[in-house]
A protein has these predicted regions:
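Active-site rim/loop-helix segments in enzyme catalytic domains that contact anionic ligands
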Residues: 1-105, 133, 137-140, 247-251
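Metal-dependent de-N-acetylase/amidase catalytic core
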Residues: 2-3, 91-262
């Protein structure tokens, strides 16, 4: 059975960025696991106006576990870091933990944020770079194992994907006032369209994505804003950048075609 490992920062990241893709690949027989670095205790409180950060973290953990069941995610691991403080970690701490988790899971694909963190969130960006470092070590380890057994199986090397928002989509959503033009003190630009290597059609899985998002009751404001445009053709797709295939960095060439699968 093939495996995908998602690595994100907060509960709901999995549903906003990859819910349709997860549902699609689970239906195709893949196992999907998720690592969440924090419990999102500094997020919106929504209906839970009296919740302390600790209580909100408990609520959001349960919301994520419920969403994971809707999507068919097999295992959810929380790393227990504090929301909003990932960039303050000593270099190597998060990276080493993620490497051990990736090595334990032995995934065919690892998916995390792109280098913009999609929304410029510092936690997202930290998770992106930490996961990339961990994946590089993992890919080298896999390469060593394949060499030891004399395997020449083409395509056996794992892949690292960045989930992203295309620059064109970000501009469109800003024009509609669906997202702000600035986020975390910087323009919300998204990733250059020319960097995107895979566009997954998730139109058949919009209802599953909706149900997963609706599990995140505490984040009702963001969920409602997203779902208000959920039937738009641009949001019937999820977008990815293939960053590494094994130990090889991947760049989109001018003659390369965008794939419709991971």
């Amino acid at each position: 059975m093939k495996k995908i490992l998602l690595v994100f920062a907060h509960p709901d990241d999995e549903s906003f960025t990859t819910a349709g893709t997860v549902a699609k690949y689970v239906k195709a027989g893949w196992e999907v696991d998720l690592v969440c670095a924090t419990r999102g205790e500094k997020g919106e409180v929504g209906l839970y106006v009296s919740a302390t950060p600790a209580k909100l973290g408990e609520i959001r953990q349960k919301e994520l576990e419920q969403a994971a069941r809707k999507l068919g995610i097999s295992n959810v691991t929380f790393l227990d870091y504090k929301d909003g403080e990932l960039e303050e970690l000593e270099y190597g701490e998060l990276e080493d933990i993620l490497y051990r988790k990736i090595e334990e899971t032995v995934p065919d694909c690892v998916i995390t944020f792109d280098t913009t963190g999609i929304s410029n969130h510092p936690d997202h960006i930290k998770v992106c770079f930490a996961t990339t470092y961990a994946f590089q070590k993992y890919a080298a380890w896999v390469g060593d194992q394949l060499q030891k057994i004399g395997s020449e199986q083409k395509g056996a090397e794992p892949k690292l994907y960045y989930a992203c928002m295309p620059e064109s989509l970000a501009a469109y959503l800003i024009k509609l006032k669906n997202i702000p033009d600035e986020s975390f003190g910087r323009p919300w630009k998204g990733s250059l369209d020319k960097l995107i290597t895979a566009v997954i059609d998730v139109g058949a899985y919009k209802s599953v994505r909706r149900r997963a998002l609706q599990c995140h009751v505490s984040q009702q404001k963001d969920v409602s804003r997203f779902l208000s445009l959920a039937n738009h053709p641009l949001l019937s797709r999820e977008y990815f950048i293939l960053r590494m295939h094994g130990t090889t960095e991947v760049f989109m060439g001018k003659n390369d075609r965008v794939s419709n699968r991971l």
